[in-house]
């Protein structure tokens, strides 16, 4: 799989209080922005140059206005192709997800506690470094599950961290991990190799266009750490085409929990367990038969 032909990006710089970073990331992710850096007094968001136009700017302004009641001033700057990996690595430190999980940069040495599961990530600009609360919530939920014999699908895999974690938690069946972003899919392939985990199939797929046919392969657990808008569209598809599968999801803000409960009720899922961190939640749900 090849990364996009151009790596030129637009950098959006928001001068906001750091307490608002998580909320802004949630809002901006709903208009298709996936890559962020947290700098001193600024949240930096990146999107491919080809995606930046008047309609995208208008969508951002509308989302910010609806969420915050006003549109904060932000700048948009062209960023030529650069070593994004170096940019990312300069900001990354090891992340202790729990007593059991540690996420580190690839090819770096860290002190590891006895019994700790280590996941080495070379993140490029893919989602899933452990720095975002939704990734941490998903991993903490996964720790509590018996994954050994489940056939697992990871939708929007990003760095591949959840699929890798499933294998390191003892899963013995084939795992399908996919993303609709070529750069992310390539990154996940690299991280699977870096962690020396076998039988994880990484694909470049569109969750909304190709999900139904892919689900026909038969899955027991669907991992979906993606944004609310995508969840709204794909959960009914999962319910129809994987009628017995559990779904572990995140990417939903706490204030959107009423929406999630209504959706789950409508498509006949029951909530097994929900956990929270900051403004985010993760829910494990299963079919109500």
UniProtKB/Swiss-Prot annotation:
GO terms for molecular function: protein-lysine N-methyltransferase activity. GO terms for biological process: methylation. S-adenosyl-L-methionine binds at residues 135, 156, 179, 225. It catalyses: L-lysyl-[protein] + 3 S-adenosyl-L-methionine = N(6),N(6),N(6)-trimethyl-L-lysyl-[protein] + 3 S-adenosyl-L-homocysteine + 3 H(+). Its EC number is 2.1.1.-. It is found in: Cytoplasm. InterPro entries: Ribosomal_L11_MeTrfase_PrmA, Ribosomal_PrmA_MeTrfase, SAM-dependent_MTases_sf. SUPFAM superfamilies: S-adenosyl-L-methionine-dependent methyltransferases (SSF53335). Keywords: Cytoplasm, Methyltransferase, S-adenosyl-L-methionine, Transferase. Belongs to the methyltransferase superfamily. PrmA family. Methylates ribosomal protein L11. This is Ribosomal protein L11 methyltransferase.
